[in-house]
Design a protein with these regions (language model features):
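Phosphate- and other anionic-substrate recognition elements at nucleic-acid/protein interfaces
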Residues: 2-9, 15-139
Length: 139
C-alpha cells in the first residue's frame, strides 16, 4: 500500500494580495489561490484542507517578517520555513504557460514574450514550495 504523501503550504506574501498554494511532497499542485493580505489568517483558514500540513514555506520578500509573525501566532503548530523568493514571479509565469499552453497564433511565440492573463501569485507560492522541496532533497 502506498504511504500517504505530505502536503506543504506555500505563501508568497504581498502588500494587497498573497499567493497561497498547497503542494504535495512530490511537487504536484493540490490547489493554489490568491488571498487578500488583509485578514489573511481568516482567508487562509478557509483555504486549508482538513489534513495536517508538513510545513509552511514562506517567501522572504518585503512583507515576509510581518507575515511570519502572523502565521506563527495564528498557526503555532505549523513549522515555518523561509526561502529566497528572488525570481519566483518569473518562474511562476513559466509554470503558468506549462499548465495552460498558449493556443492559436500565440503558440508560435516564445512564452517569455507572453503575459499571463491573470495574476500568478498563487503559482509563485507553488514555486516557493517546489524550491524548498528541491533543496531539501539535495541536502
Amino acid at each position: 500500500m502506498d504511504e500517504p504523501m505530505e502536503l506543504y503550504l506555500g505563501v508568497d506574501p504581498g502588500r494587497d494580495k498573497t499567493g497561497a498554494a498547497l503542494v504535495w511532497e512530490n511537487g504536484r499542485i493540490f490547489k493554489q489561490e490568491i488571498l487578500p493580505t488583509d485578514d489573511f489568517s481568516r482567508h487562509l483558514q478557509q483555504f486549508l484542507p482538513e489534513q495536517p500540513l508538513a510545513g509552511c514555506i514562506l517567501g522572504d520578500g518585503t512583507t515576509s517578517k510581518t507575515m511570519a509573525a502572523q502565521l506563527e501566532k495564528d498557526f503555532p503548530q505549523l513549522p515555518l520555513f523561509t526561502v529566497n523568493e528572488y525570481g519566483s514571479t518569473q518562474e511562476a509565469k513559466k509554470l503558468y504557460w506549462q499548465l495552460h499552453p498558449p493556443k492559436g497564433w500565440k503558440r508560435l511565440l516564445p512564452t517569455a514574450l507572453l503575459d499571463a492573463p491573470s495574476a500568478v501569485d498563487g503559482l509563485a507560492a507553488v514555486v516557493l514550495v517546489q524550491r524548498y522541496l528541491r533543496d531539501k532533497t539535495i541536502k
